[in-house]
Amino acid sequence: MSRAAAVALRLAEARSPRLSVNPARIEGGGPNNVVPDLAILRVNFRPADLGEIERARAHIDATVAAVAAAHDVAISVHGGFNRPPKPIDAGAARLFGIVKQAGTDLGLDIAWRDTGGVCDGNNIAACGVPVVDTMGVRGGAIHSDQEFLIPDSLPERAALSALTILRIAEKGSL
């Protein structure tokens, strides 16, 4: 477990404004008088661009090599970067402009903010299709057992989606 913690701490050092690193969970162990033969570390990396993926991979490789050598342990890496970064490109900026104007016309303040989150939209954007996320209902505490939605936001968000789709249909393209 302590070796997994060493890996977690070293991986966290890769954090930067362009790379989010979350050593989220260490599993393993048992009675406190037994040295476990296995520990599993789960880490989430969220890169802002493809260059950060390469930097993260290099940091992972260097961390694994350093901790394995220093502590005489075997470390295996599983998984990878399965959601490419989703930067705001020209198409996404045009789409956001349509959404923002639709919001203004409905009396809604629509603002863009980078959350660093990932979703299926990352895969769609990687195919060159413009994506704007989180147009759904308002709420909070996302991804927790306290997650909630504000019921009054259902009609406003339906109207926002409908007006956005109408405007795109009227233009015939983005």
What positions do the PLM features span?
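Metal-dependent amide/peptide-bond hydrolase catalytic core
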Residues: 1-174
